[in-house]
């Protein structure tokens, strides 16, 4: 269930529990036969697996949820976080750019991330090669958030393994699922508000 469908089901059925109970008929109406929702034991196992990976859930409507996300039309109802969630409540700027960036591009990314970080901004990017990598590396000491398209158990790109560890320890990773095995180039789960 995607974000738009989640909110539509919630609006139609009033509560998440009621929406879950109606999922099989919603799936049938969408042409999906024999849909069987996961049981409570699966949900508990997923939660434990996330906690074991060092991740915790942040739900919309809780104090940990970033206020800026509420302004998004497709604000995630929840997401996983690994690292320092207090970074979500500081002023944040996104720095993204070319994966195959020139030395001028990566140099400018480092300069902007350093300068803005010193002014109190958290730098947010997607941990891709090039500009993203340069921005995160420069902002480790002042605050950085990496928005991942995959999970914490598969680093993509592989050359960012050490940077990912540093962000886990000194920044924040946010993601849809803490163990999605197949991150895909160009996929970022959310826009940072």
What are these regions (language model features)?
Residues 1-62:
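Short, small/acidic-rich helices and loops at N termini and domain boundaries
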Residues 57-193:
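Glycine-biased, small-residue-rich flexible motifs in mid-sequence functional cores and linkers
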């Amino acid at each position: 269930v995607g974000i738009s469908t989640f909110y539509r089901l919630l609006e139609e059925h009033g509560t998440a529990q009621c929406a879950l109970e109606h999922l099989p008929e919603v799936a049938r109406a969408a042409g999906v036969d024999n849909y069987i929702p996961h049981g409570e034991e699966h949900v508990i196992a997923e939660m434990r697996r996330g906690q074991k990976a060092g991740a915790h859930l942040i739900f919309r409507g809780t104090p940990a949820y970033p206020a800026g996300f509420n302004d998004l039309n497709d604000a995630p109802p929840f997401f996983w976080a690994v690292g320092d969630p207090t970074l979500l409540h500081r002023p944040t700027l996104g720095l993204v750019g070319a994966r195959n960036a020139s030395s001028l591009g990566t140099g400018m990314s480092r300069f902007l991330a350093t300068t803005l970080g010193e002014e109190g901004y958290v730098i947010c990017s997607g941990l891709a090669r090039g500009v993203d990598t340069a921005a995160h590396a420069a902002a480790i000491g002042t605050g950085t958030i990496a928005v991942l398209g995959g999970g914490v158990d598969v680093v993509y790109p592989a050359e960012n393994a050490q940077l990912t560890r540093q962000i886990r320890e000194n920044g924040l990773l946010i993601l849809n699922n803490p163990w999605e095995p197949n991150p895909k180039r160009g996929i970022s789960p959310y826009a940072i508000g």
